[in-house]
Amino acid sequence: MRKMAILAAAVALLLVVVAPTGAASGPTIVELETVASGLTAPVGLTHAGDGSGRLFIVEQTGQIRVVEVGTLLAAPFLEISGLLPTLNAFFDERGLLGVAFHPAYEGNGRFYVRYSVPRSGDPGEPCFGTSRGCHSEVLAEYRVSAGDPNVADPSSGLVLFAVDEPQFNHDAGDVAFGPDGFLYFTLGDGGGANDGLADSPPSHGPIGNGQNIETTLGSILRIDVDHRAVCHRGRTLQVGTAATDAHLRHGDTPGACAGDTSTALYRIPSDNPFADTTGADEIYAYGLRNPYKFSFDDGPGGNGALYLADVGQNLFEEVNIIERGGNYGWVIREGFHCFDPFNPTTPPATCSDTGPSGEPLIDPIVEYSHPGSGFSPEIGITVIGGFVYRGSESPGLVGSYLFGDFAKAFFAPSGTLLFINDPTGPSPTIEQFQIGLDDRDYGLFLKGFGEDEDGEVYACGSIALAPTGTTGVCQRIVAEN
């Protein structure tokens, strides 16, 4: 039987506590060293793994910027703003959302980006008031230019995967290579609220997208981009969809295998949980709402675990360790708690502890709640996933999972930097970093994290809520004690 909500809350309180500033060991103090400023909505940072020491910063507005020898280069590495929808000046979750460099990038020059495209090809297509939905989410491959390592070849873009999204939000968008050499990327549940179940009729189907293994929405996906001539039982690119439109914009056309309508642009790993069975072949794990950020603990001493932060709705934010084939509960649960789409601010006392096919629902390792929710600890409204620290500048943080929260309130630049000092231990706890000896506020909307080739971790944020302005910064997190 499903745990009682009171029991779940008790378990959560045992597992998740914010260490008070006055704890006997004292706060963990960090300084933030700015490596790039003047950015527009920086949502992430990474490296190419080529020994160059360069940092690559993703701006939501469609640019990838390069930091080389401590200097932010004026010219972008990649500029694809012309492919994006017109982003809302108030707030938007669409845009350029993630980049991952191939493990053999130094030799093959290949990298992969996640971004949004308008379904009709018109950048101004509205998100609302249309039965066609809002936009499509795309995974594309690009290559570095032959003449300049700091500039990509814009004509090399090749769309590998695209899926229609009914709303502008819950686009997730992170992308990374795993220790197995396969490419992982995330998709949200399609947006709106309650996974569509409170709509009449349910706009995301009778069980919502998160619990529906026939759709890739609400999932983390895994594909093999190194064997693209092999047919798979994949998604079809229909004429007139954004996927086909994007191919044509990039100067390519959808391919096909003999006797199959697959695009043959990637292969499905044979041990994907639904490979050649019922369910979407690309799914690695599901039951997710808005898995905006994830990472692998693949640095020195790491165990390769996949950490994923799933953004909650009204009450709870969560961090998960992802298992192949795992069902992480949305829309049956939010965090450790039962979820009622018709009354989302009051967790039901009971609910199913299995998915539609009887598979067990997997709990997060930690959760926290929104300010004013009445559930402890109250931290913020949107979890931003980070990295397990495997660097050398802050030895006291080695093995800790560094992450944070977007803001304490939607309109206030009030992000929070957090960590879990023993994320794989029996009782992981959330702790808050103290910024500086003066204990100052972060003072930004936290929009993403990043990691360099040496395992140092960075936080990226902006004063602006929307993808506008140039108040964005990326800063290295360095422990002072």
Can you annotate each of these PLM segments?
Residues 43-46, 100, 176, 295, ...:
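Conserved beta-strand position repeated across blades of beta-propeller domains
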Residues 34-62, 380-388:
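Beta-strand-rich domains and repeat architectures in extracellular enzymes and scaffolds
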Residues 73-101:
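Blade-loop segments of beta-propeller domains
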Residues 7-17:
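Bacterial N-terminal signal peptides
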Residues 34-40, 78-81, 89-91, 161-167, ...:
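Surface loop/turn motifs at the tips and blade-to-blade linkers of beta-strand repeat domains
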Residues 125-176:
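Asp-box/WD-like beta-propeller blade repeats and closely related beta-sheet repeat scaffolds
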Residues 24-40, 153-157, 362-365:
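A short helix->beta-strand "capping" segment at the edge of beta-propeller domains
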Residues 58-61, 89, 94-96, 104, ...:
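Beta-propeller domain segments
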